[in-house]
Amino acid sequence: MGLSWQQLLILLLVVVVIFGTKKLRNIGSDLGGAVKDFKKAMNDDQPKDAEFKKISEEVEQTSVENSKQKEQA
């Protein structure tokens, strides 16, 4: 019950007539830029390997020190 290719073609022609090719091109480039920025932001949120290793080593060292202190007490 979807749209046939003829109906999609007519719909595309109507959209081009209403908005014009220049405005559609601008909308496409704006949408592409937004998607690119979103992907970049998602990748920036992931911790860097070096930072992650450093933090995990600090946590491990602190855990060992705490264990030694508990054993001595």
UniProtKB/Swiss-Prot annotation:
Q: Where are the transmembrane segments?
A: 1-21
Q: Main location per UniProt?
A: membrane
Gene Ontology molecular-function annotations:
protein transmembrane transporter activity
Gene3D superfamilies hit by this protein: 1.20.5.3310
The subunit structure is: The Tat system comprises two distinct complexes: a TatABC complex, containing multiple copies of TatA, TatB and TatC subunits, and a separate TatA complex, containing only TatA subunits. Substrates initially bind to the TatABC complex, which probably triggers association of the separate TatA complex to form the active translocon.
Family statement = Belongs to the TatA/E family.
Q: What does this protein do?
A: Part of the twin-arginine translocation (Tat) system that transports large folded proteins containing a characteristic twin-arginine motif in their signal peptide across membranes. TatA could form the protein-conducting channel of the Tat system.
Record protein name field = Sec-independent protein translocase protein TatA
Organism field:
Histophilus somni (strain 2336) (Haemophilus somnus)
Q: Where in the cell is it found?
A: Cell inner membrane
Identify the GO cellular component terms for this protein: TAT protein transport complex
List the keywords (alphabetical).
Cell inner membrane, Cell membrane, Membrane, Protein transport, Translocation, Transmembrane, Transmembrane helix, Transport
One Pfam family named in its UniProt record: TatA_B_E
Q: Which domain of life is it from?
A: Bacteria
Which gene is the coding source of this polypeptide chain?
A: tatA
**Biological process per Gene Ontology, one example term:** protein transport by the Tat complex
Question: How does the entry describe its membrane topology?
Answer: Single-pass membrane protein
